[in-house]
Every structure is written in C-alpha cells, then in structure tokens.
C-alpha cells in the first residue's frame, strides 16, 4: 500500500507545473557625498606599500683639510749676542785696501713690553690662630640637713656662683702652597748692529817694506833638443 502511494506521488510531481523563478532587482549602491570643508577635515588613509631601503656604508678615503690658526708672537724676549772684538792681524791688515763702513741691517731695539714674573709653588708651614670660647661653668654646692643634739632642722641655701672664663687662643700649624718669586736671568733689551765691517788704523813702522811681485824674464841662449819617449817615434818631415 505504501509502495502504491509512493508511485502515485512521484507521477503527480512529474506531471505538475514547474516552479516559477522570481528575479529580484540588484540593490543600488548608496553614495553619500561629504564636503571637505576646512573646519571639518576628513582623514584620508592611503594604502602605501612600505619598502625597506637597504643602505650600504662604504668608507671612502678623503683628504682632510683642516685650517690651523697660526699665532705670530711679536713680544718675545730675544737673547742678545755677546759682543766680541775682532782681532786684527797686522800682517794681514796693513797691506789690505781700505774697506769703508757699510751697515747691512739697521740697528733695532728689542723691547720687553710686559715684565716677566717667575714664581714657583713651595709648600710652607703657616700658623693658624683660632679663639676658643669656653662655656660658663655653674658650680652648685648643696648642703645637706644634719641632725644635731638639739632637735632643730638646720637648713642652708645652695651656693650658686658662676665662673666666667677668659677665651683661649689656640694655634695650629697648617701647610699651604705659597708662590715664591724666583731669580731668573732674563736678557735685557740692547741695541744690535750686525753685519758690519770696518778697518782700524794701525801704526805702520818705517822698516816695513811692501813686497812687489816682479815678473821673471827668460833669455833663450841655446836650442835644447826635446827628448824622445819610449814607444813613440817622431819623423822629421812633420
């Protein structure tokens, strides 16, 4: 029975009308425009791909040019040369021509503008005085009551006296660094006259005779034959 009903239901479903398909319209996109006024800014987020830039550090040798300031000191203390008198040799000076005094460098004076003070630090003892004030001392003596033969209470007041001491001055030795002036030999400014030459007048005795070079004369008297050297023969034709 159930099989018969199942077969009838299948035939009825096959012969029935097909179901209708309902096509619904696609919903439209709703667009809302907002004016970007200056007082109402809108955040704009852009999807920008982040790329990592790899930087390679290369040590490139370069010439280092550094300007070094040059200090020119014009106030330095110069050491003056020791004056030495020129020893005059009479034999070489008498027969020499006269050389006039020709100064090459003008005399100049080396001035020391700032006085030079040299000191050295020496550790020396120095007494340091300090006044010590002693506090006041209050001496209080208490007399106890004692019972004597007579039944009478003996009371004495406490003795209260103040000792006012005199301030005491204490002295201790303290080692401090003291600048002690030094004796330094500094050259004094002098006038220098260098690169000069002169000739002093030397008294010439009368017995000094000036030597004069006399040219030698040769007189040819006889012809002297030239000796022949070994290994060389000279012909008479030449």
Curated annotation (Swiss-Prot):
Keyword set, alphabetical order: Secreted, Signal
Residues in the signal sequence: 1-16
GO CC terms, sorted: extracellular region
Tissue-specific expression: Prismatic layer of shell (at protein level). Expressed primarily in the mantle with highest level in the mantle edge and lower level in the mantle pallium.
Location in or out of the cell: Secreted
Protein name: Valine-rich protein
Organism name: Margaritifera margaritifera
